Amino acid sequence: MNKIEGHVIGTDLKIGIVVSRFNDFITSKLLSGAEDTLLRHGVKADDIDVAWVPGAFEIPLIAKKMAETKKYDAVITLGTVIRGATSHYDYVCNEAAKGIAASSMSTGVPVIFGVLTTDTIEQAVERAGTKAGNKGAEAAAAAIEMANLTRSLQ
């Protein structure tokens, strides 16, 4: 049986990152975690492009545009949606998730879901570099692995 898997060596990879400005006190920490992980795994700083969008709902369009250029081996999406008193949370989370997945499927470029969907600010803070690690860093590691796995299947 042949085993096919990616590795986490980022040398020669070009990575796009789409980050939401909404809740930037969280998303900036996710971005720092992602950038640090990419650099530690060999991606050069000049090979990382960051696009800022207003909110999580706007992430899929820019992720798809970045992926369509074929300039990037993977695109990382980072955002934070925190539940409020209305159903707005559900719409934003669902559409962001669907759009991000569709971006990957329609372009063949790994588009990694790094959007936090939490009930509280505290949960978001925990996932942006405290108790629960940094989900931006995890998304970056997944991007490297998926970029390499995708390359190996071409």
UniProtKB/Swiss-Prot annotation:
Keywords: Riboflavin biosynthesis, Transferase
GO CC terms in record: cytosol; riboflavin synthase complex
Reactions listed under catalytic activity: (2S)-2-hydroxy-3-oxobutyl phosphate + 5-amino-6-(D-ribitylamino)uracil = 6,7-dimethyl-8-(1-D-ribityl)lumazine + phosphate + 2 H2O + H(+)
UniProt GO molecular function: 6,7-dimethyl-8-ribityllumazine synthase activity
Stored CDD domains: Lumazine_synthase-I
Residues involved in (2S)-2-hydroxy-3-oxobutyl phosphate binding: A85, T86, R127
EC number: 2.5.1.78
A Pfam family recorded for this sequence: DMRL_synthase
InterPro entries tied to this protein: LS (IPR034964), LS/RS (IPR002180), LS/RS_sf (IPR036467)
Catalytic residues (UniProt): H88 (proton donor)
UniProt keyword DNA-binding, yes or no: no
One GO-annotated biological process of the protein: riboflavin biosynthetic process
Residues given in the record as 5-amino-6-(D-ribitylamino)uracil binding sites: F22, A56, F57, E58, T80, V81, I82, F113
Pathway field: Cofactor biosynthesis; riboflavin biosynthesis; riboflavin from 2-hydroxy-3-oxobutyl phosphate and 5-amino-6-(D-ribitylamino)uracil: step 1/2
Function as written in the Swiss-Prot or TrEMBL entry: Catalyzes the formation of 6,7-dimethyl-8-ribityllumazine by condensation of 5-amino-6-(D-ribitylamino)uracil with 3,4-dihydroxy-2-butanone 4-phosphate. This is the penultimate step in the biosynthesis of riboflavin.
HAMAP family recorded: Lumazine_synth
Oligomeric and partner information: Forms an icosahedral capsid composed of 60 subunits, arranged as a dodecamer of pentamers.
Family: Belongs to the DMRL synthase family.
Protein name: 6,7-dimethyl-8-ribityllumazine synthase
Organism the protein comes from: Bacillus licheniformis (strain ATCC 14580 / DSM 13 / JCM 2505 / CCUG 7422 / NBRC 12200 / NCIMB 9375 / NCTC 10341 / NRRL NRS-1264 / Gibson 46)
Gene encoding the protein: ribH
